[in-house]
Amino acid sequence: HGGCYWNTISLFESILEGLQKANEKYGDTIVSIGADTWGCDYTLLDKQGNMLGGHRQYRDPRIEGMQEEMESRMPMESVFACTGVQPAFYNSSLHLLAEGVKNNPCLDIADRLLFTPDLLAYWLSGVQSNERTVTSTSQLYDPIKRDWAWEVIDALGLPRKMFGDIVSSGT
């Protein structure tokens, strides 16, 4: 595929190794765990929960020209008013826009969008959801409505079906 990707499988294997060591040392005293990472990077999943096209990094070069493309679809002032997120090259919104502009078929088949900590939490728990604070970094979340920024999502031409439940931290 080209581009910059995270080796998410290796990261997850390291998490499992760490959990095994913690279990050996602390046993039943561990009652919960959480997944917290950087924001912006995401993975698209199919209906069976399989990754589509890898886990791209925010440094991926495919976003060249996407700020201008986004501006042509919705003024950045309007995006900021809706999301509270300043325009930046690493915004998830631009990367997802690039998926559509470059006709990535993964966007059409995607059943779910999960950000990095949400993907790890899904692999640990089997629950697909988007945690509110990391979702807020995507430039696709409306903090006033406490919901996806549908106006932005629609302006970018992104399929609504892949935007799932948003949950509070610690759930």
Regions found by a protein language model. Name each.
Residues 1-54, 65, 81, 109, ...:
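N-terminal glycine/serine-rich phosphate-binding loop of ATP-dependent small-molecule kinases
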Residues 26, 73-78:
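FAD-binding glycine-rich core of flavoenzymes that anchor FAD
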Residues 45, 79-171:
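Gly/Ser/Thr-rich active-site cleft segment
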Residues 56-57, 134:
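Residue-level structural signal for beta-strand termini and adjacent loop
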Residues 60:
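Carbohydrate-associated surface elements
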Residues 63, 72, 85-89:
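Gly/Ser-rich phosphate-binding catalytic loop and adjacent alpha/beta segment
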Residues 65-69, 140-142:
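Short, charged, surface-exposed secondary-structure boundary motifs
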